[in-house]
Amino acid sequence: MDHAIYTAMGAASQTLNQQAVTASNLANASTPGFRAQLNALRAVPVEGLSLPTRTLVTASTPGADMTPGKMDYTSRPLDVALQQDGWLAVQSADGSEGYTRNGSIQVEPTGQLTIQGHPVIGEAGPIAVPEGAEITIAADGTISALNPGDPANTVAPVGRLKLVKATGSEVQRGDDGIFRLSAESQATRGPILQADPTLRVMSGVLEGSNVNAVAAMSDMIASARRFEMQMKVISSVDDNAGRANQLLSMS
């Protein structure tokens, strides 16, 4: 089989992977605090016993775009926005600690505070609030609850959000969408981040996604055209091979 088919096939496969990343970004254009996943294509020379005349392509995801999203005023007491390098600690499905910029906190029927289904971690573990209580969040992350029918002066703290600080280069996104410390960062900062008492949150405000929907749509169209071009290359090479076989059979 002509080597050009392998080259075009590899390019088409990686273009599909790149399009999947773009589609994921586009799907999260309205997710609070979402950080767009970066993607790129790079050339990979084919090495072997023969001359290095071929170059394949592979897709790579160098990380996330840490550009802050726009702040949206919601007036919802359980919505919080963080400073640029601040993160909220949450518990992932395997019980490990992860971090998110999504400040849309929800209250489960059990009173558990969650973000996108992940329990919110406080300085003493996962946070739960009394059923039906009115919840407020202070600038330092302290969560207070007022039980139904109680006077306003009986507001009591029930926990404090674990606010941590990390730069974009220190964390990486997992398959569940939650960020964790990279292996290099764990070597210097430990397996989990410690709470930073200097961080502050803004209650009633949400940071929006930093995905540019128009640019993402343009990338989707460009990826589709690249894929179509690679398919035409494969078809052309196959046609040429068929015609060559016909000529050989005639001789």
Segment roles from a protein language model:
Residues M1-S251:
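Amphipathic alpha-helical polymerization modules
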